[in-house]
Amino acid sequence: MTTATHDPSIETVSDSAWCTSTPRRGTAGGLRSVGTALDVLECFAMDSTLGVSDVARRLGVAKSTAHRVLTTLAGRGFVEQDASGSYRLGLHLYELGMLSHARNGLRHVALPVMQAVADQTGHTVNLGVPDGADVVFVERIESVDGVRILGHTGRRQPAHCTSSGVVIAAFNPGVDRERRHAGFPPKAKGTIRRVEDWDRALTDVRRRGHAALHSGSFTDASSVAVPIRVHGQAVGSISVLGPTPLIEPDMRRVVPLLTAAANRIAKQYSA
């Protein structure tokens, strides 16, 4: 098992749950009022508390509209108002989110396999699934050495900023297409920034079966990922993440473990 001392320069990163580089989903063909309510909820991905004026300004709507939507959402428990009059996400939204999390079949299959990889490597292990142009980490087992990089934030990342996103896009045309449409804005010094580099990375993954990214999302952090493929298409990824000095020298040992884990998850998930 990899051993390491805590690096004070690698701490839990304060990062928004929402990818500002990713276009928000449209509401073409849907109800405008529902779209507005969802836009209001998404405002809270950037800030824990917001006032009526804050929401109105961000969405470009009248304060009266923002107030009506917030009042309706509060009545259903999706937001709640504190003593100062500001709003925050409500417990009912948390309940629904936990139900979605608990009912994720891939997560149920992957969790014991992830734990085995964590025990063998000592690194943080992530399960990523695609969502549009992004990858969302639906499960995480933290490193035993106390080095925390993501903590409870950073659950959603643009696909081009993570090894998980790259390996999924290499075997999932939909993710590849969505990321190309969204572009490749830089996030850290190792972020893929050009379509030519994206093409090269996907070709490399298809040849080698895994991806490694250094300082893709966070400076001096590295990750290695392998796709979880069902009927040839990537439905997720399993990866390890940690400070670059720990991950880089351990890649030769880690990649076969991740490959075996991904194959086991895919076999059980598709059974």
Model-based region annotation:
Residues 2-103, 107, 233, 263-271:
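N-terminal helix-turn-helix
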Residues 2-7, 11, 18, 146-217:
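Short, solvent-exposed recognition segments
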Residues 222-226:
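Short hydrophobic beta-strand micro-motif common in sensory/regulatory domains
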Residues 228-230:
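Sensor-regulatory modules in signal-transduction proteins
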